[in-house]
Amino acid sequence: MKIKSMLVGSLAVAVLIVGISVYAQVNRPYHNGSAWNIAFIRIKPGMNTAYMNYLASSWKAEQEAQKKDGNILSYKVMSVEGHTTGEWNLMLMTEYKDLATMEANQDKAEAVAQRVVGNDEAQIKGYKERAEIREVLGNRLAREIILEPKSR
């Protein structure tokens, strides 16, 4: 009987703790959306048309192939006003379903790049050519935050 009382008491304490922890959980007014890889580019002076020609041809072809194969959701090119010399003036944004999908599809994405752009040598050659017209100042991963409707 003593063991039964201890078990019932332990069960009651466990239920109480679980109840308190559930009650204590914060009700967040948002949920995670898609993930974005954002490249910050500085187009060199006088090279805007040359870089836009690359983006409208090879870069766009690769992005469309990645989208068709389900590796990405979308992509965007955002021109921004640079305020100081050497500051980035273009963002290349690639949208993924989530970070896990982005990581899981790396091999598939590389295969698409090989198919569309070419082998490693061709990709390196293109990167060197583009280095003459633009500079990659950095990349960031971002996660979209979807705000929930305000509850009444």
Task: For the regions a language model picked out, list residue spans one by one.
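Positively charged n-region of N-terminal signal peptides that target proteins for export
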Residues: 1-5
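Bacterial N-terminal signal peptides
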Residues: 9-19
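Immediate post-signal-peptide N-terminus of mature secreted/exported proteins
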Residues: 25-50
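An amphipathic, aromatic/His-enriched active-site/gating alpha helix that lines ligand/cofactor pockets
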Residues: 27-30, 61, 65-73, 93-143, ...
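Extracellular/periplasmic catalytic domains that process cell-envelope and extracellular macromolecules
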Residues: 29-33, 83-88, 132
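Structural recognition of the beta-strand scaffold that forms the well-ordered cores
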Residues: 37-40, 74-76, 91-94
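N-terminal, post-signal-peptide region of Sec/Tat-exported proteins
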Residues: 44-88
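Short, solvent-exposed mixed-charge patches
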Residues: 151-152
